[in-house]
Amino acid sequence: MIAKHLILSGRVQGVGFRDWMVTRARRLALAGWVRNRADGTLEALVAGDAPAVEELLRACRRGPPLADVTDIVETFAEPPAEPGFVKRATG
């Protein structure tokens, strides 16, 4: 299992990105969370089998139809303590 902390930049808020990401992460049996940040970026913690995490990262580079992802900063992280993948409030 691997875990990654992500910060996505570009047009990533107001385009349904969080719900889109929750759906894909759950399909891939990943754990973690996603939330909007006050600075206009999107933040996520994603954990699971390495191939599934990488598949979600590839999908995030495209994003949902109205999104325009210009950058993803990823760092390795500790896995979340709780199972499942959830949408969090803006932080």
Swiss-Prot record:
Record EC number: 3.6.1.7
Enzyme class: hydrolase
Domain called Acylphosphatase-like: residue spans: 3-89
InterPro entries: Acylphosphatase, Acylphosphatase-like_dom, Acylphosphatase-like_dom_sf, Acylphosphatase_CS
Catalytic residues identified in the record: 18, 36
Pfam families, A to Z: Acylphosphatase (PF00708)
Superkingdom, taxonomy of origin: Bacteria
Catalytic reactions of this protein: an acyl phosphate + H2O = a carboxylate + phosphate + H(+)
A molecular function (GO) term: acylphosphatase activity
This protein's UniProt keywords: Hydrolase
Family listed: Belongs to the acylphosphatase family.
Protein name: Acylphosphatase
Source organism (scientific name): Acidiphilium cryptum (strain JF-5)
Gene that this sequence comes from: acyP
